[in-house]
């Protein structure tokens, strides 16, 4: 485990984009998908300066290591939430592979949860990569049912604040 005192969370800056995208690439390339699929989809996971106009983005910085993780979120559509709930969607959560299992992801999720609370939301939803659902479930997220197979992403999860 890392010492959480050596990790601080701050707003992502435009100058962080290259470091963040390197972390995203390392994470995506480790997913349980065919190599061709990872290469073809990687571009859709990378962030640009324009994304910072539409998402809240924070980075986890570890003393002596620089940026080791990122989380982004925004408000989400009602059809992606449990009925009669208001929430935010965790758009992205990535931790550099060599810093995983050290509490960085939990710190980033807690930051998003706090933002949801501050905005008067009831929870946080995420559309997870299939092999990441266990991680989110271990953090208290629960699966949302697929009500419309043509529209609903199959790995949607919810965590009430």
Report the location of each language-model feature:
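A short beta-loop-alpha structural element at the N-terminal edge
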Residues: 8-22
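A short helix-loop-beta-strand connector motif used in the catalytic cores of GNAT acetyltransferases and
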Residues: 48-59, 89
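Conserved catalytic-core motifs of GNAT/GCN5-like acyltransferases
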Residues: 125-127, 142-159
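Conserved GNAT acetyl-CoA-binding A-motif
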Residues: 116-129
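Conserved beta-strand in the GNAT
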Residues: 66-75, 89, 94
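A conserved beta-turn-beta hairpin within the catalytic core of GNAT-like acetyltransferases
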Residues: 76-91, 100, 150-153
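Conserved acetyl-CoA-binding loop-helix of GNAT-fold acetyltransferases
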Residues: 95, 101-114, 138
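Conserved GNAT-fold acetyl-CoA-binding loop/helix
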Residues: 21, 25-47
């Amino acid at each position: 485990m890392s010492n959480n005192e050596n990790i601080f969370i701050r707003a992502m800056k435009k100058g962080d984009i290259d470091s963040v995208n390197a972390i995203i690439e390392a994470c995506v390339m480790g997913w349980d998908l065919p190599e061709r699929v990872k290469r073809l989809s990687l571009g859709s996971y990378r962030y640009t300066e324009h994304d910072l106009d539409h998402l809240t983005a924070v980075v986890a910085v570890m003393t002596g290591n620089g940026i080791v993780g990122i989380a982004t979120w925004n408000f989400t559509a009602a059809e992606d939430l449990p009925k009669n709930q208001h929430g935010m969607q965790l758009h992205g959560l990535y931790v550099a592979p060599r810093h995983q299992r050290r509490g960085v992801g939990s710190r980033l999720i807690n930051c998003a949860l706090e933002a949801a609370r501050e905005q008067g939301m009831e929870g946080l939803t995420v559309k997870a990569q299939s092999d990441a659902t266990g991680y989110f479930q271990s953090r208290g997220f629960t699966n949302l049912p697929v009500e419309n197979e043509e529209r609903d992403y199959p790995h949607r999860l919810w965590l009430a604040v």
